[in-house]
Amino acid sequence: MRDLRVTLAQVDQVWEDKAANLRHFEDVLAPVSNTDLIVLPEMFQTAFSMNGDALAETMEDSETLRWLKRMAQVKNAAFYTSFIVRDEGRLYNRGVFVEPSGIVH
């Protein structure tokens, strides 16, 4: 049985600025290699915010989910994190596990 290699990324975030946070995490993760799982903070792309109405995305049209899928493929590692999702009119802090293949759980 081989070891599970996990990378934890706990960094300062830019309050409610998705684009800045996605760029920042891409820079932070640039040197990361040879890992199986990358765990990002809760609500990593906005920092923990109660402004869900303005920041929520749908799973079907999520910039954040597209970014996670791309990064999982680039890093050949699974990602776990959460972000604000609007589903059937309600808001959720939804945890997602993204495989390098692009499958989302």
Walk through the language-model features, giving the residues of each.
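General secondary-structure edge motif
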Residues: 1, 5, 51-52
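Active-site-proximal beta-strand elements of phosphoester/diester hydrolases
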Residues: 3-13, 17, 94, 105
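Glycine-rich anion/phosphate-binding loops
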Residues: 19-24
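Cys-nucleophile CN-hydrolase/nitrilase-fold catalytic domain and related Cys-dependent amidase chemistry
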Residues: 27-100
